[in-house]
């Protein structure tokens, strides 16, 4: 087993195909996939190791997640259609850090019942078979070992959107991730917000197998009534 690093804007299929080109004489498989906009460590198995892939599917993982305040999309990251937004002057970092800190920080291990994210593979497959299925139909219990705020701050809004567009533009154009519509959306918002800053907090999450980071942020957003979305989901380690 070797650990490889996936960059943001790369789909899981593109990632594994790149590895296969480097090891043309070996059977290859991977586990612990990452969403296109996420980055970080992915374990890759070779040859007979693939027979033991099940041994690598229930591992705990650590993420650092930059959560943007005031915007929310249907995908809960920047590769999504905006559901709602709120002027940054009505939401401050003090609101989040002082008034809502308890929603973001967990010191002791808990089990939560979590929906499968709307854009998760299982939910997508279910809807392809039955359009009446929603992510509400699928839940599972997952472990959250700890969650804490490790950073907070603000970014220049236009520079941040430019970074978002650059990453979105890398996503496989042979697949329909709604890239054109989403990029046009961010361009429009960029041009209507002059001299604006956007606030963020960075969470460090230590979680169990099957934990949906984007769903976790959506659930917090729904609970506190403040638009939130993931910008940078970075898997920093896997506990082997």
Describe the role of every protein-language-model region.
Residues 1-240:
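Catalytic/RNA-binding core of pseudouridine synthases
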């Amino acid at each position: 087993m070797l650990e490889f690093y996936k960059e943001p804007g790369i789909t899981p299929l593109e990632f594994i195909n790149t590895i296969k080109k480097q090891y043309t004489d070996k059977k290859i498989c991977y586990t612990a996939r990452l969403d296109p906009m996420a980055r970080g460590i992915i374990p890759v198995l070779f040859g007979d190791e693939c027979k033991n892939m099940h041994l690598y599917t229930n591992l705990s993982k650590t993420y650092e997640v930059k959560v943007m305040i005031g915007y929310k999309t249907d995908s809960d990251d920047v590769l999504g259609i905006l559901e709602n937004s709120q002027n940054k002057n009505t939401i401050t970092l003090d609101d989040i850090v002082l008034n809502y800190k308890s929603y973001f920080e967990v010191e002791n291990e808990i089990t939560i019942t979590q929906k499968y994210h709307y854009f998760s593979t299982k939910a997508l497959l279910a809807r392809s078979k039955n359009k009446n299925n929603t992510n509400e139909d699928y839940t599972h219990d997952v472990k959250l070992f700890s969650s804490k705020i490790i950073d907070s701050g603000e970014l220049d809004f236009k520079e941040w959107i430019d970074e978002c567009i650059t990453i979105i533009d890398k996503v496989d154009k042979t697949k329909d991730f709604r890239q054109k519509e989403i990029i046009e959306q961010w361009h429009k918002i960029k041009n209507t917000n002059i001299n604006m800053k956007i606030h963020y907090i960075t969470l460090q999450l230590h979680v169990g197998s099957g934990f949906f980071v984007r769903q976790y942020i959506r659930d917090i957003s729904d609970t506190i009534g403040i638009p939130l979305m993931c910008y940078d989901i970075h898997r920093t380690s896997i506990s082997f």
